[in-house]
């Protein structure tokens, strides 16, 4: 489930990056990645 979500958010980040420019795209991609990692860590800690 996580892999599917990561894939979708990565694709979304790349699409946004292609639309608004590489620098902003990298920032958006990094932000999404950080959110995903934090979410996985929080989910793992709850179990």
From Swiss-Prot:
Task: Classify the protein's membrane topology as the record does.
Answer: Single-pass membrane protein
Q: Which GO terms describe its cellular component?
A: host cell membrane; membrane
Which compartment or compartments is the protein found in? Answer: Host membrane
The residue range of the signal peptide is 1-23
Q: Keyword annotations for this protein?
A: Host membrane, Membrane, Signal, Transmembrane, Transmembrane helix
Major place of residence: host cell
Tell me where the transmembrane regions lie. Answer: 24-43
Keyword Membrane among UniProt keywords: yes
Protein's UniProt name:
Protein 0.5
Q: Which organism is it from?
A: Escherichia phage T7 (Bacteriophage T7)
